[in-house]
């Protein structure tokens, strides 16, 4: 059977080394006689494992000691509610940057609990390619202390590489699709969060990295499962967590550490994205609509000039072992999600398929 490559935006591809480790331990984890799916979250062996998981993540992202790491349920959408519910007592009218679909979803959910000031980021076109204004030009209100934004919009393939520098501003970032793909200066943020199913592991666990002073100031009367203080006090085990997702996440952190950390991962991701965008720029059969300054390293969106061939392209790509290339239903087209676990061989195979398809139908 030929090698299969998963270009889905999530659940995404997992590293082969991690899959082999899962296979080895699935029926008998840590020589316990139990499957990892059966192990008690209260067992000393699993608690010891979670301590190492947190330590590895803290080292990978250089998380300062005055930040806490929480493991939660509900994905990023759960955090769209949890953030205003926990923090709005202190920050009554937050700012929400609208740079695309997911940041817009976060703002829409926040409206249920507060009156967010929505800042629509300006969009421009240059040589038929779109880009958005730099964070330094965002019209931020000085009186609103907490600012929420999403640095990578997966649907359109737009990434914001500049980190906002805002004095006296609590910055909260939805890093669901870009966490662990590049270096982040955690000190610039009051809180960041990410669902697992893109660069971390299987869906089922959500990572929250929150500064101590924000954790202390959280509201009290909110649903327990979304309460940051309760999550912290219970060591992220207020109820039975997603053991398997937590376990695989730990294996992924170890895999990144063994590769050499985020410096190595970021270089690999830059290289993968560079060769794919370079090919797209060299052809008159496909095109990408995003200016290089905002081209996502994780989600490469593109179209065929002969749009009527799009569905056939998807069918033929699957026959070649290339899955998940259909664009989001909102904008259509095509999308290759090339998260951390996607090897450069997968990107090269995609490019070769695209060249062959162009020869046949161009």
UniProtKB/Swiss-Prot annotation:
Q: Name one GO biological process term.
A: L-serine biosynthetic process
Q: What is its main location?
A: cytoplasm
Which N-terminal residues, if any, form the signal peptide? none
- A Pfam family of the record is Aminotran_5
Q: Which PROSITE patterns match?
A: AA_TRANSFER_CLASS_5 (PS00595)
Which pathway does the database say it acts in?
Amino-acid biosynthesis; L-serine biosynthesis; L-serine from 3-phospho-D-glycerate: step 2/3; Cofactor biosynthesis; pyridoxine 5'-phosphate biosynthesis; pyridoxine 5'-phosphate from D-erythrose 4-phosphate: step 3/5
Keyword Cytoplasm assigned to the entry: answer is yes
Q: What is the annotated localization of this protein?
A: Cytoplasm
Catalytic reaction equation(s)? O-phospho-L-serine + 2-oxoglutarate = 3-phosphooxypyruvate + L-glutamate; 4-(phosphooxy)-L-threonine + 2-oxoglutarate = (R)-3-hydroxy-2-oxo-4-phosphooxybutanoate + L-glutamate
Task: State the EC number(s).
Answer: 2.6.1.52
The first-level EC class reads transferase
Query: Has UniProt tagged this entry with the keyword Transferase?
Result: yes
Binding positions for L-glutamate per the UniProt entry: 42
- What does the cofactor section's free text say about binding? Binds 1 pyridoxal phosphate per subunit.
Lineage: superkingdom: Bacteria
Annotated function: Catalyzes the reversible conversion of 3-phosphohydroxypyruvate to phosphoserine and of 3-hydroxy-2-oxo-4-phosphonooxybutanoate to phosphohydroxythreonine.
Query: How does this protein assemble?
Result: Homodimer.
**Which NCBIfam families does the UniProt record give?**
PRK05355.1, serC_1
Task: Identify this protein by name.
Answer: Phosphoserine aminotransferase
- UniProt organism field: Buchnera aphidicola subsp. Cinara cedri (strain Cc)
